[in-house]
């Protein structure tokens, strides 16, 4: 029996969200929930499915971390920055419902937010500031790329993203060309 080899296809470098675009999105958030959602996605790199499954009890504000259940119900810890902590606390302070879910709909009965709800909201926010193709997964890719660009070891990025294979993480690591040039000058030139 012959082995069937994979056909090599062009690998497109997928876009990330610029720091300026993130600031534009933040500035145009009309409600505390959206701001908290953007900052949590941006600083943790969690999947949208993990985001909507988060409960308030999964968040440890003191340690600035939360427990997420990834693919295959694998539990892992992710960490968020001070800005995300501030915006999450502000959002929770203004909530009036008793739903244990971290992110809920804005209108009563304040149900747990669904994946499609997050996608639609982010798309709307993106369009409001003339940014096309803003979706939850782009925040994940942006976080991974930023972490690697700043020198975080790929194995640690793999752990944060919850990947079992390093190859998967490598696909997220869209290498910044200016960093490649700087590294070349540092090590070679």
Regions found by a protein language model. Give the residues of each.
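Conserved catalytic core of the tyrosine transesterase superfamily
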Residues: 1-189
